[in-house]
């Protein structure tokens, strides 16, 4: 194959290359004749035994099929031979445009060869970050008495005192506690797990779907109602996700909020030995919450440092994919987010390349326990059924790739944070919250 083709560079723009290949006409036609002979040996032509039809007849019937096969094979072999010997690195996108075909029935050697253009984009080698030059904040939260009191007040709000409503004309409000019966159907069939009797629901707590609670507001004790209810696509119960059902509800009792209970009653209600143990629990939970905020803040510091101190040519095709992801994130959020999408996409791709380089250089890999821990902290702790997440992990390749990428990213970030120089700070919970909100 060494002398069967010649290559001419058409363009070279950073990571994007284009070459024109001219495959020698004689070489190509020899390959085509070989393919026709192969077909002739195996094809059954009406009036002939297998392999006994003349080559002229086979050529007449199967030339186009053979031409297509040989063109494909020739392009694959010549382009891969060239790329392999040229050592471009990792090619992440490519395209073939055929310019001309040789004529099988012409003896004129001056007629065109098989000519095609190969354009491709390569993934550049990212530099290895020098962790010794990185200085990150080491923030310790100063938990004050007001923070503990606020936490306990929130506990009280979760379990206020309620008193039953005796007035049959009372209209349900958005903070009432209800006892209801409900039943879910699709096309008249009761759904598994979609019905309950004497179900206790406190409105406004985010326990039920907002659309469901909205239908209950304005009803009265003893009233029944049937309405369509559409479950979100990411609903925890997979068999209901994305479906519209006929929901029937009967209100059996209504309770209105009377007031907040004192700290001793709340401590007992939550199972604490006394108020002191509840306050100790509050400090631990506050620290956990703010440790996660601090991690996000420090990660932002690290990303800003990486973005400011490393200049990399990023592949256009990867940036295009990232732009599509960001636009989808914005649409799914339902918020009016104003950002330079292309700039954000370029930054994400660059940071990803730097983190991948760091992971490969230091042999940082992910294990099953890393994935499970990530799912626990990012899904299960927020009420999502971990079993459903694990099923998606096995059945949805895109979701599995997303989780793997996030887990590896977090592991590399923790590795860098652990080795970077530290600027120790003690900050109040309020100040940390303000920093977190401004990210």
From Swiss-Prot:
Top EC group: isomerase
Q: Any idea which GO molecular function terms this record carries?
A: peptidyl-prolyl cis-trans isomerase activity
Task: Give all residue intervals belonging to the PPIase FKBP-type domain.
Answer: 175-260
What biological-process GO terms show up in the record? cell division; protein folding; protein transport
Which residue windows are transmembrane per the record? Answer: none
Known InterPro entries for this protein? PPIase_dom_sf, PPIase_FKBP_dom, Trig_fac, Trigger_fac_C, Trigger_fac_C_sf, Trigger_fac_ribosome-bd_bac, Trigger_fac_ribosome-bd_sf, Trigger_fact/SurA_dom_sf
Q: Answer whether the UniProt record assigns the keyword Cell division to this protein.
A: yes
> Which reactions does this protein catalyse?
[protein]-peptidylproline (omega=180) = [protein]-peptidylproline (omega=0)
User: Under which EC number(s) is this enzyme classified?
Assistant: 5.2.1.8
UniProt KW keywords: Cell cycle, Cell division, Chaperone, Cytoplasm, Isomerase, Rotamase
Q: Does the keyword Chaperone apply?
A: yes
PROSITE patterns membership: FKBP_PPIASE (PS50059)
Q: Which Gene Ontology cellular component annotation is one that this UniProt entry carries? A: cytoplasm
Localization: Cytoplasm
The record comments on the domains as follows: Consists of 3 domains; the N-terminus binds the ribosome, the middle domain has PPIase activity, while the C-terminus has intrinsic chaperone activity on its own.
Q: What does this protein do?
A: Involved in protein export. Acts as a chaperone by maintaining the newly synthesized protein in an open conformation. Functions as a peptidyl-prolyl cis-trans isomerase.
The family assignment reads: Belongs to the FKBP-type PPIase family. Tig subfamily.
Write the protein's name: Trigger factor
Q: Which organism is it from?
A: Ehrlichia chaffeensis (strain ATCC CRL-10679 / Arkansas)
